[in-house]
Curated annotation (Swiss-Prot):
Residues 1-77 are annotated as: Disordered. It is found in: Nucleus. The keyword Aminoacyl-tRNA synthetase does not apply. Pfam families: HATPase_c_3, Morc6_S5. This is Protein MICRORCHIDIA 6. It comes from Arabidopsis thaliana. Its cofactor is Mg(2+); Mn(2+). The keyword Electron transport does not apply.
Length: 663
């Protein structure tokens, strides 16, 4: 970046104007059926010369949609020699730019620009490649309100070199020319809906640049009987190889001309040719006709994103593996078979390297009218809560700075595979989107907490901009502490149901204190109870040397067990007076059967009480209904009697009328 006292930041696409020698010689608007323009593509020298000319020109043309902060001056590129982009993402940002000169404007002033290296550094927020894919799917899911019915994630091929590329396509509302510039720029976001996942207007850039060095976008939009289509290119390869010191985004805009029956360009001739020349040099398509053919399967509205020059891992293999499983996309080298087969095959283990598994739990709710199609096959939606045994529903009302947030319902239970799996964690969603999958809130070395999984939607905490974590706030810390408590409380109350035995910890021997002669022993005050063991036996119940207040303790409204368990939840070896400790896992013991039977009876009793309450409510409703019917019946009786009186009166009138006629 270069700057001085006068700072001018432009978020719109800025297109470098080629030198005279690189300008196309002819121009005319063409429809989709035309062959379009083409440029020489034979050698790296041609590619470099055009790029250098575009980068080192003395003038620039700002894209058609301007903002008050548009940089209306010229641009110059760095004097650094073009260098190929390293194909490994985590090394692609380490090139020497010390020779880069400051961007000079004709009036002698320096302006603040976004350097191409920001594309790479901005994308490093995505440590996990699937997190970047999820960001792109969020854009499609946000389009459900505009009629989107599907999003496609698939492998495609770069026609220029045959290399693998990633395709993401949806049939949402699409983007008009202005929206395309906001998408390619920084800091624009028009997602004001409370249900929208996107917020910062940065996700498209971070996610696409994390998956590959270059991305080309095709979008068609229809509004007020106006049909437009736009093509935009964000190319890290182009910017670095041509030595640009600012981000340059070529964009082509077309509008359908109903009278001519074809698409016409919206930009002026010079601007259009400048943008087209860059697109044909650095995109996967070498002619305008090939570019326009990409709209053939888009339909009247929708967006197609193609990410190419995809990043390699440290073994020089594609970071995303498209070949191992025909209907899935894997992260190369991330499959680790460390545990038993049942653990390795579980969704909590596979989501980290299988995109199909991750997408199945990515959204808490998906409309039946919307489909996620991965490699040609629909992703089946999976609700983790459906995998739980003995589920409990715990209410939690977060509070911070004296204000109360919305009530949160947490579903918690044992995995169906428990106790054979050593998995644990909470799937925490925000506005329907999974932010933290299987978040482990406790560290367990023994059995405590194993197999306990929960699901909740925490809209009261804000996710980080990469949507893979939450901002570290007081609310998040309180939530984490409460989830720790829930885990231990649930485990302590229900572990016998999956085959664990709970034993009381051996009691400590506390000698009886002898009162000094002449001193009267003090008794505890009313409302307190102190228990002291006698003798040397260790089989007596656990004792407490602290007085216990017999007053009912103030419980948290969503508490399900004693508050004593809340003292040291994170420590696996903690003991609490009067509470149980899990010692070992056993099969077939008499005490285990007894405990399980007791818990089952308690659950059955709870169900019966719920049924009784339900029937009582239904009985009351029926009584009210009966009273209403009786009241209506009385009204009908009164009406009937009134009508009978009127009928009798009419009969009398008729009789009198007949007599008068006869006489």
């Amino acid at each position: 970046m270069s700057h001085d006292r006068s700072v001018n930041v432009s978020h719109d696409a800025v297109i470098a104007k080629p030198e005279r020698g690189t300008m196309l010689q002819s121009f005319s608007p063409r429809s989709h059926g035309s062959k379009g323009y083409s440029l020489p593509q034979d050698s790296e020298e041609n590619r470099g010369s055009v790029g250098q000319s575009a980068g080192q020109s003395s003038t620039s043309v700002v894209d058609q949609v301007r903002s008050p902060a548009d940089d209306a001056g010229v641009t110059s590129s760095s004097t650094i020699c073009p260098a190929p982009v390293c194909r490994q993402f985590w090394k692609a940002g380490s090139y020497n730019d010390e020779l880069s000169s400051k961007s000079q404007q004709p009036n002698g002033k320096n302006y603040l620009h976004v350097h191409p290296m920001f594309l790479h550094s901005n994308a490093t927020s995505h440590k996990w490649a699937f997190g970047a894919v999820a960001e792109l799917l969020d854009n499609a899911v946000d389009e459900i309100q505009n009629g989107a019915t599907f999003v496609i994630v698939d492998k495609t091929t770069n026609p220029r070199d045959g290399a693998t590329a990633l395709l993401i396509q949806d049939d949402g509302g699409g983007m008009d020319p202005q929206a395309m510039r906001h998408c390619m720029g920084f800091g624009f976001s028009d997602k004001k809906s409370d249900s929208a996942i996107g917020r910062y207007g940065n996700g498209f850039k971070t996610s696409t640049m994390r998956l590959g060095a270059d991305v080309i976008v095709f979008s068609r939009h229809s509004k007020n009987q106006t049909l437009t289509q736009s093509i935009g290119l964000l190319s890290y390869t182009y910017l670095t190889r041509t030595g640009h010191d600012r981000i340059v985004v070529p964009i082509l805009d077309y509008e359908f001309n109903a009278s001519a029956g074809e698409f016409k360009t919206l930009q002026d001739r010079e601007h259009f040719i400048s943008s087209l020349s860059i697109l044909l040099e650095w995109s996967p398509f070498s002619t305008e006709a090939e570019l326009l053919q990409q709209f053939d399967d888009v339909g009247p509205h929708g967006t197609k994103v193609i990410i190419y020059n995809m990043w390699l891992n440290s073994d020089a293999k594609l970071e995303l593996d498209f070949d191992s499983v025909a209907e899935d996309i894997l992260i190369e080298g991330s499959i680790k078979k460390t545990g038993s087969k049942i653990v390795n095959d579980h969704i909590a283990s596979r989501f980290s390297y299988s995109l199909r598994v991750y997408l199945s739990i990515l959204y808490l709710r998906i409309p039946e009218t919307f489909k996620i199609i991965l490699r040609g096959k629909v992703v089946e939606h999976h609700n983790v809560a459906d995998d739980l045994m003995h589920p409990q529903y715990i209410l939690y009302k977060p509070q911070a700075a004296g204000s109360e947030e919305a009530l949160v319902v947490t579903t918690i239970g044992f995995l169906k595979e428990a106790p054979k799996v050593n998995l644990h964690g909470f799937c925490v969603y925000h506005k329907n989107r999974l932010i933290m999958p299987f978040w482990q809130v406790i560290n367990y070395s023994s059995s405590r907490g194993r197999g306990v999984v929960g699901v909740l939607e925490a809209n009261f905490v804000e996710p980080t901009h990469n949507k893979q974590d939450f901002e570290k706030t007081v609310l998040l810390q309180k939530l984490e502490n409460r989830l720790k408590e829930m885990t231990v409380e649930y485990w302590s109350c229900h572990c016998v149901l999956i085959g664990y035995q709970v034993n009381k910890k051996p009691r400590l021997q506390i000698p009886q204190k002898v009162q000094p002669a002449g001193r009267q022993a003090l008794s505890p005050p009313p409302g307190f109870q102190a228990v002291f063991p006698q003798g040397n036996t260790t089989s007596l119940p656990r004792v407490s040397t602290q007085p216990v207040l017999l007053e009912k303790r103030k419980e948290h409204p969503d508490s399900v067990a004693s508050a004593a368990l809340k003292r040291k939840v994170g420590n696996d070896d903690f003991t609490v007076p009067g509470h149980i400790r899990v010692e070992q896992f056993i099969h077939g013991s008499a005490s285990q059967s007894q405990d399980i039977e007791t818990v089952k009876l308690m659950e059955e009793n709870k169900k019966l009480r719920a049924k009784c309450l339900d029937r009582k409510v239904r009985s009351q409703n029926l009584e009210v209904k009966a009273m209403n019917l009786r009241s209506e019946l009385e009204n009908y009786k009164s009406e009937y009697e009134r009508l009978m009186v009127e009928l009798q009166a009419l009969d009398l009138v008729k009789d009198e009328h007949r007599r008068n006629v006869n006489t």
